[in-house]
Amino acid sequence: MTSRLDHTIVIPSSPEQNWARSVSPCTPTRLFGLPPMSISPPSLPSPSRLFEEIGLGQQKNPPSPKSPFSSAAGKTATSKAITENPSRNESSSKRGRPGSSEAKTAGSRKNSKSQETRNKILTGRVAKPTTVSKAKATAASKSKDTSVVKAKAGTKKSKPASQNKKDKLAEEAEAEAKEVADAEGLNLEEALKRRSDWTPPKALSLVSIDEDTPSQGSGTKLSFGDVLRDYHYNRENSSCEPAQPSKEGNPTKRRRLELVEFEVLQERKPIQQKQIKDAVKTRKTKSKPKKQLNTITARVTARYEQIGELEDLFVYNEESSCETSECLKKPTKPKKETAGKQKEPEYIILSPDAATKSLNDQNFLFGTCSQLERDDSPTFFEETQTAIQLSECLTFKKTASTITTASSAMSIATRFTGKKSHWSEAARDFNGAVVQPEIIDMTDSPTVSVALSRLSEVKHDAPKMASLVSSQSVSATNSLVPKDVVTASKPAADVQLASSGPEPNKTELAAGPFRKTASRLPEMPNFNGYTDSELKNQVLSYGFSLRAVRGRKKMIELLDKCWQSKHGNTATAAIVETSSSAAINETVSVSAARHSDTQVSDKLPTRKKKTTPSRLEPKTTSRAGKKKVSEKPLAGKADKPVEKAASPIPASTYNMVDEIEDSEEEIIPSPTRIQIQRQSSSRQTTPAISCLPLGTKSKRSLKSTKSSTYDEATLLELQSSITKAIHLQTRPRRSLGGSSYSPQLTWHEKILLYEPIILEDFAAWLNTEGFALACEDREVGVALVRTWCESRGICCTFRP
């Protein structure tokens, strides 16, 4: 029974052939007209034996390929011969062709098979088993039917030779019939390949594709349309809502994809048409403005663009608030107005001539952002500045007047005083002329009244301050001025007292008690005002050698220590006390000191240093004259404290600050500066050098009085002599002693190299050597040398 599993029945898949048109095959019975050998039907074998013999026969005689016509003819002939005339095969086998030995041995087997399968008709087509399945089938059949095979073998051996010939012929005919059956069109091998490629699903019920109604034989009555509905999109089950139009009414570029349903589409057609109409309206109203080209001119003029009307900017809010169709039609009206406005030129660009004209009409402001920035009230800043300037002018009224009349007023200035400020110097018109600052009368301003009230409070304390100032003047003169000089200076002091007015009398009365206490205490002299030779003499007087003490600073420190050890600390305490009190009322003392310096210096003789025997006496007297110049006004201030000019005068409440000279920054002076210098020199009648701070450098005041006795013609002669002396100087040799007046370079070479000229050294060289080369017998001071340097743009400075 296992052999049945190796055979499969295949449902016919290929179309049936039309046998009426096929050619009938030529068989021996048809060719020779022989009757069939036996008419009696053979006995039917068992089904297991039938399939076993068919498998063995197929293994021995494989089918050979033939042409389609011959195969078709053979198939029809063999089928007829097998079914209708089974007896003819026996007779034909007797007269068969002589075959080989292999055909004779296999003839008896095939004959029996053909007889057994004569009347069997299969409803389907039998597929050929593979070689493996055939081997299994033969092994199973041999094990089960051994008895049948043995019986067959016994019968075969007992058969006679005539019977063997018949069997051979029958087997040959059967083999030909099988070959025709294989080529008949079953194509079993190809059918197996098709089946392996695709196997249809099991059909539970036959469904007619053409009809929509379900078949009667199926249990579940489903049509083909019902089956496809399971795969169809069902709108009822979907939870998506219909697409709502956007708030603006514009259809988006990306639209939702939906399956088309005819019923839903018909319902949506009027809605979509309405939305399209609304979208067209909104597109017309909401047309985007065209992008303009971004140019440099557009960027510059954008900040001056006129802002449009605000009504056009809020059109969108009105549309969103309106819900009816009437509201949507209203905003179209202002759009027409804006379209008309856009035609006008947005930017009005001026021509080059008009642009330059507008620039010329503008007022330029100079200064930093902090200076140009103002508070909420524009008058507050101006009133504050005016009040400060007024208070300074009241405090430094006399000081400012002397600074403007002095010859050196252009080089040294204070921080708070001066007629011209920094911005007034820089203000110029289009022609290059200096613009004079505006003068504003702020006397009625409340801020000025507050400042004046404060100044009145300060004036009440003036007697006390003046009494402290007088103590310093008395103590300074007692230590430095001899008695003979004091008596000689009294007439000059009286002249100054008469012109000073009522203020010096008040200070004189208040300074009485302090005069006696200060005169009793010895005061330490100011060694910083001594010259190098004077310092050396003082050091030698205390018994020190000059080799051990070198340098100006070391000598001053040594002299201070020696004086303190000799006189004690009481004098130093008095100096500190008087110096602190002198800082209160400096303005009166400074102005009086300048007048006394200029008037006393006219009466003093001069002496020069020793260079030649012929000039011995004038030079010796000049040294004494220098000392008397600084001491005589001090003696006058001992009796009249208004004209105080003590050597260590500290800074006042408004410190005098030495600024950097303009000659150091600009080697070649500007034309305006030269013009101002000429005007100041022409106006000058008594060129006093009194604007220097006397407390820091008293040596400057000692040497500055040289130019007080010179008029304009004398100044020009001395300046030409200075120029001649510089050109006549030869290169000096370096001395072994290391004196300060033996530089390696000449003064002319230093000037060419822009090296700062030390005024003290240059003046000393002119008085000792320079004027001798130029045949000049007079001497010059530091102030005149400084004026000469600044007029020629030479960098000069005082000794540090």
From Swiss-Prot:
| Coiled-coil positions | none
Give the chief site where it resides. Answer: nucleus
Asked if the Swiss-Prot or TrEMBL record annotates the protein with the keyword DNA damage, the reply is yes
UniProt-annotated location(s) = Nucleus
Q: What InterPro entries does the record point to? A: Slx4_ascomycetes, Structure-sp_endonuc_su_Slx4
Give yes or no: UniProt keyword Nucleus. Answer: yes
A GO molecular-function descriptor: 5'-flap endonuclease activity
One GO cellular component this record assigns the protein to is: Slx1-Slx4 complex
The free-text function statement in the UniProt record for this protein reads: Regulatory subunit of the slx1-slx4 structure-specific endonuclease that resolves DNA secondary structures generated during DNA repair and recombination. Has endonuclease activity towards branched DNA substrates, introducing single-strand cuts in duplex DNA close to junctions with ss-DNA.
Describe its assembly: Forms a heterodimer with slx1.
The name of this protein is Structure-specific endonuclease subunit slx4
The species is Talaromyces stipitatus (strain ATCC 10500 / CBS 375.48 / QM 6759 / NRRL 1006) (Penicillium stipitatum)
Protein encoded by which gene: slx4
